């Protein structure tokens, strides 16, 4: 019998620090990394590159099923590779975001991408970053982590990120946007944002990223008997 590669799922709301934690875990353990939040954007960009009709579910399904995408952590930064090309910046454009929203509306496209995400589960293991990784995509994962933080702290972090990039931002507006997104994510009909019953819940509100990584790594090593 072939052993199934282990998975560490990291779910949680936007701005809790999932991306940073997952990149650190992938680099330390030498495992594969899946950024599920970027998958639809990568599909949208592939559709644009290959001139696939974004309104056609029939045309998008095979593209989704065979999507050539990799996530490569490099010294604290994540490179998103589509067909061997780094598209980390390109997938963040408004045009790609709008196209991604249209693609996500098709049930068969979602199903194809679900199977594509599960295909990332290869040896020696996978770190899966998302919102329903531990509850839906990899519900049998041996290690599940739910990373949370207060809406105020997540808004503060986001404000600092944007200010570092030279943007002028309003804290109250950011906080309102985060609270609205939280409400949508936690109350949606399909796969609402919630910790898996067997997940370790980490509240990073008052923790440094080093503390979060240390706690998550020690927990994972204990469960997986990694020294």
From Swiss-Prot:
SUPFAM superfamilies in alphabetical order: P-loop containing nucleoside triphosphate hydrolases
InterPro entries: Cytidylate_kin, Cytidylate_kinase_dom, P-loop_NTPase
One of the GO BP terms on file: pyrimidine nucleotide metabolic process
EC class (word): transferase
Record keywords: ATP-binding, Cytoplasm, Kinase, Nucleotide-binding, Transferase
Localization terms from the record: Cytoplasm
GO cellular component, one term: cytosol
Catalytic reaction list: CMP + ATP = CDP + ADP; dCMP + ATP = dCDP + ADP
One term of GO molecular function: ATP binding
EC number(s) per entry: 2.7.4.25
Assigned protein family: Belongs to the cytidylate kinase family. Type 1 subfamily.
UniProt xrefs under NCBIfam families: cmk
Protein name: Cytidylate kinase
The organism of origin for this protein: Photorhabdus laumondii subsp. laumondii (strain DSM 15139 / CIP 105565 / TT01) (Photorhabdus luminescens subsp. laumondii)
Gene (name only): cmk
């Amino acid at each position: 019998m072939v052993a199934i590669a282990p998975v560490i799922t990291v779910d949680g709301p936007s701005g809790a620090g999932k991306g940073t934690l997952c990149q650190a875990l992938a680099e330390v353990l030498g495992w594969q990394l899946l950024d599920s939040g970027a998958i639809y954007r990568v599909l949208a960009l592939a559709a644009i590159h290959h001139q696939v009709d974004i309104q056609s579910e029939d045309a998008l399904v095979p593209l989704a099923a065979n999507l050539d995408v990799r996530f490569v952590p490099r010294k604290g930064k994540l490179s998103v590779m589509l067909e061997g090309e780094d598209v980390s910046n390109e997938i963040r454009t408004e045009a790609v975001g709008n196209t991604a929203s249209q693609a996500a509306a098709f049930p068969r496209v979602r199903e194809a991408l679900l199977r594509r995400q599960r295909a990332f589960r290869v040896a020696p293991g996978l770190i899966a970053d998302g919102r329903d990784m531990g509850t839906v995509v990899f519900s049998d994962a041996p290690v599940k982590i739910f990373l949370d933080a207060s809406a105020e702290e997540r808004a503060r972090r986001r404000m600092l990120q944007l200010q570092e990039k030279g943007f002028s931002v309003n804290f109250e507006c950011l906080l309102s946007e985060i609270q609205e997104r939280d409400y949508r994510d936690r109350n949606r009909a399909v796969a609402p944002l919630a910790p898996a019953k067997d997940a370790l819940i980490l509240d990073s509100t008052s923790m440094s990223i080093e503390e979060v990584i240390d706690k998550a790594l020690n927990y994972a090593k204990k469960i997986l008997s990694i020294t």
